[in-house]
Regions:
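Short glycine-rich anion-binding loops that position phosphate/pyrophosphate groups of nucleotides
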Residues: 82-87, 142, 183-186, 205-207, ...
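Rossmann-fold NAD(P)-binding glycine/threonine-rich loop
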Residues: 91-103, 196, 201-244
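Redox-cofactor binding/interface segments in oxidoreductases and associated redox assembly factors
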Residues: 79-81, 180, 201-202, 234
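Active-site cofactor/substrate anionic-group-binding motifs, chiefly glycine-
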Residues: 34-74
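Positively charged, low-complexity intrinsically disordered leader regions
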Residues: 1-22
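Anion-binding alpha/beta catalytic cores of soluble intermediary-metabolism enzymes, centered on
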Residues: 2-7, 70-129, 185-188
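Glycine-rich phosphate/diphosphate-binding loop of Rossmann-like nucleotide-binding domains
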Residues: 30-44, 62, 112-199, 213-215
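Short beta-strand segments enriched in small/hydrophobic residues
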Residues: 23-31
Length: 244
């Protein structure tokens, strides 16, 4: 069964109300790749649908971006920075915590929209995490770590791996649920990569917008693609903006 993102996204759009009369989001881009630009387009479409004004600006230098942040954040409910050039830090560390709607920094009151999206998908389709063995192939502060924290709070047994983990498939092939977010193209291409009946959620996206998993080659029955996760992530991002 495909865990489609659209019905999850639609439910979030319909039920999450704004605490502000005029919610707005500032999207800053620094050396954006194709994935960043695709995400921006999705954010703009979603903002138009749910009534969140979206302003985007691309900065060429970090210092210029810091200045823009300091001068512009007070005019927006939330701020996100799309800067895949940096794995951490960069402009994101200068976002005020109360405006940090994508959980870029530890003091943010929100998890990242992507991490929340994975949990929303699992909840929507009635996946009980208690007692399940979950393997997360990502150790980042915005995806892997918050997901591990949330899943542990649901009494799952969580193993966190990454692209450098030795014999990675030894872990994924034993998991009840796999969430992968490497973003370097097809990483899993064999039926042996996952056990029969496992749920596989692909969050990864490379420069050609390909995910981490070749679902057909792996013969995965229960799955969500990066497009499914992306659809829910944009809805969760807008929900965070409405809460800010």
């Amino acid at each position: 069964m495909r865990l489609e993102g659209k019905p999850v996204s639609d439910e979030i759009d319909d039920t999450r109300r704004s605490f502000s009369s005029d919610p707005s989001l500032l999207v800053m881009l620094y050396k954006p790749n194709e994935g960043d630009l695709a995400y921006l387009r999705a954010i703009e479409r979603k903002g138009e649908k749910v009534g969140v004004e979206v302003e985007s600006v691309e900065v060429k230098k970090t210092l210029a971006g810091v200045d823009y942040l300091h001068n512009s954040t007070e005019h927006h409910s939330g701020v996100i920075v799309l800067d895949s050039y940096f794995t951490c830090g960069g402009l994101k560390q200068f976002i005020p915590s109360e405006k940090d709607v994508d959980g870029a920094n530890p003091r943010s009151p929100w998890y990242s929209a992507t991490a929340d999206a994975v949990m929303e998908i699992l909840d929507f389709y009635g996946v009980d995490l208690e007692g399940k063995h979950v393997v997360i192939v990502n150790r980042s502060r915005t995806v892997g770590r918050p997901l591990a924290e949330m899943m542990l709070s649901r009494d799952a047994t969580v193993t966190v791996c990454h692209s450098k983990t030795n014999r990675l498939r030894r872990y994924t092939s034993m998991a009840d649920i796999v969430v992968t977010a490497v973003g370097k193209g097809p990483l899993f291409t064999q039926p042996e990569d996952f056990k029969p009946g496992a749920i596989v959620i692909d969050v990864g996206m490379d420069k050609d917008l390909r995910g981490d998993v070749d679902f057909e080659a792996c013969r995965v029955e229960n799955y969500a693609t990066n497009k499914d996760v992306g659809a829910v992530a944009t809805s969760m991002l807008m929900a965070h903006v409405k809460e800010a």
